[in-house]
């Protein structure tokens, strides 16, 4: 099974820059439609952009589900490891779904 390495330092809670100017009448942001495989390819050339996308989606999942995430030095590695597992099962899964599954697995209500 191919491992998706979305970068060990990928999950850093970043500001929500691409979500700030969102207007539903303009449709969903294009980042919403990125698959795990596409994010993996994109990370090879623009890891900062992928890190930001993952952080924004992760924050949205945590906030909308009111999850409690215990901050620790291992958090980034734990999130990336779980995200890689989820993406490896279905590389064509939307990244936002994979991140939501990951955050629900790590977080607590």
From Swiss-Prot:
Gene3D superfamilies: YmgD protein. GO terms for cellular component: outer membrane-bounded periplasmic space. Residues 1-19 form the signal peptide. Keywords: Signal. This is Uncharacterized protein YmgD. It comes from Escherichia coli (strain K12).
């Amino acid at each position: 099974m191919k491992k998706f390495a979305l970068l060990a330092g990928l999950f850093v809670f970043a500001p929500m820059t691409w979500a700030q100017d969102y207007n539903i009448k303009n449709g969903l942001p294009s980042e919403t439609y990125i698959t795990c495989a596409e994010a993996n390819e994109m990370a090879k050339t623009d890891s900062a952009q992928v890190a930001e996308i993952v952080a924004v989606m992760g924050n949205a999942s945590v906030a909308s589900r009111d999850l409690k995430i215990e901050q620790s030095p291992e958090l980034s590695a734990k999130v990336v490891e779980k995200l890689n597992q989820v993406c490896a099962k279905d590389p064509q899964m939307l990244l936002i779904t994979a991140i939501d599954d990951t955050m629900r697995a790590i977080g607590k209500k």
